[in-house]
Design a protein with these regions (language model features):
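A short acidic-to-branched-hydrophobic micro-motif
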Residues: 37-54
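Short amphipathic alpha-helical signal-transduction/dimerization elements
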Residues: 72, 114-125
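Hydrophobic residues embedded in beta-strands of well-ordered beta-sheets
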Residues: 26-27, 46, 89-91
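Short, internal acidic amphipathic alpha-helical interface segments
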Residues: 49-89
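Charge-rich, low-complexity N-terminal segments
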Residues: 1-38, 73-85
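Short, highly charged C-terminal tails/helix-capping segments
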Residues: 125-133
Length: 133
């Protein structure tokens, strides 16, 4: 099954504790802890991503980037990237999976991203200005 916004929303609606909003090209899914995951369907893959913090809030970008490269593989199914949004760079956590993935795999990806966001924020907190922690 190739996923689209409608089919992902139908699946997300079955998950307890998830709040779903349809946006122009993605779904915004929030859990009961206030973590937001944005899911983008494409022809070949689904991307699930969550904003971590703005690059401008990082005290030591080189140090953080070195730590990210050494540690992001410690948490399953999720990696770290930098994405520009409205002219500002943000660190994001994301996962990618095949657009032919089974529904259980899609749910696992989103659930894992929800869990990993908090872990990444804790792991990288020493590199952030106080107001971002």
């Amino acid at each position: 099954m190739a996923w689209d916004l409608e089919s992902i929303k139908a699946l997300a609606d079955t998950q307890e504790g998830w709040s779903i909003e349809v946006e122009e090209h993605c779904l915004s899914i929030s859990n009961d802890e206030g973590v937001d995951v944005f899911v983008y369907p494409g022809e070949q893959q689904l991307i699930a991503e969550s904003l971590l913090f703005p690059l401008a809030s990082v005290k030591d970008v080189d140090g953080l980037n070195a730590l990210v490269l050494r540690t992001h593989q410690l948490l399953p199914l999720t990696t770290i990237g930098i994405k520009q949004i409205a002219g500002e760079d943000y660190y994001i956590a994301f996962g990618a999976l095949s657009s032919d993935s089974k529904d259980t795999v899609v749910v696992e990806e989103i659930d894992t991203l929800f869990a990993n966001v908090g872990e990444f924020l804790e792991l990288y907190a020493e590199f952030l200005t106080h107001e971002e922690v």
